[in-house]
Amino acid sequence: MYGMGNGADKIIEVLDALGIEVADFFASDGFVRGHSFHGKKVLSFSEIKGKYEKFIVLLAFGSSLPDVMARFYGIAEETELYAPDGPVCGGELFDAAFYLENKEKVDRVRDLLADEKSKEIYDDLISYKLSGDISYLRHADTEKDEALKEILSGGYTAYADLGAYNGDTLRESLAYYPTIRRITAFEPSAKTFAKLTAYTDTVEGVEIHACPLCAWNKTETVILTDGAGRNTTIGGTSVGKTKNGAKVRTSECDALDNQNDYTGEKLLIKYDVEGAEYEALQGSLRTIRANETEMIVSLYHKSGDLFSLPLMIHEIMPDHKLYLRKHPYVPAWDINLYVCL
């Protein structure tokens, strides 16, 4: 197994249930420090090649960095490599049984997609999820610039960033769409919310409402596993810390509809809320319908997101076009649905 940490733990849990044992663990050369993981000394890839004549590599972490992805693809050229598709926010695995159970919905979504590129990417993603073969991911990759310039219509006057992290996507949207004059941003992680507001305090000429909230379908207090941004999810059993050090605490949630009064705006909404996309959409219905709305929706946090969220969105916005794009990442993260007029 290549990699350690939370991703490896999740894969090992599935392997244990299947009665499959990991023979050894290895890390990138610069990260081999003589330490152990799950009772085994962590080796380098060179040591693995010296120890085993034939072996299968399971990739247990992800990256969008070009040099790291090049390393993944390089190892895949040397030996058999798979990147298991585990849901980021838990739940069912996207295995053959799950696919067959939901095949009718999967096929309906394919028919709804607006262009052939979207359908090719959709096919590649399903093939990857069922096989773990990362060559499908490389074939599906497109640059985000194409979507932001050529798929979305632009000219937005307002922007809602649900899952605003440290302000990176807010900064990106203002660069692509300088006509934006009103922004609502949700970010529940305290550490990254501080970074977000440090950035928004520097933005001039734009009315920004930053909310230290989880995007949800109602006003509610929930248990939050605070992974400091990207890994912050609703859920947890008790307040404290996880074994990986994430804080588990109470947090306030609210609907986007309760935090803005947008009407008649050319509005872009981004949903990247770590598995709460369905509820966040439910909490946005007034806002969506009161404005000329386009959306960017993440489809990779739960196994069913790839088909359940497009079906929900089509029901809400039947006249909008649905474009699917996957931006460079291994495993199948950064999958976005672009919902356009």
Language-model-derived ranges and their functions:
Residues 2, 6-18, 22-23, 28-341:
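Phosphate/nucleotide-binding beta-alpha loop and adjacent structural elements of enzyme active sites
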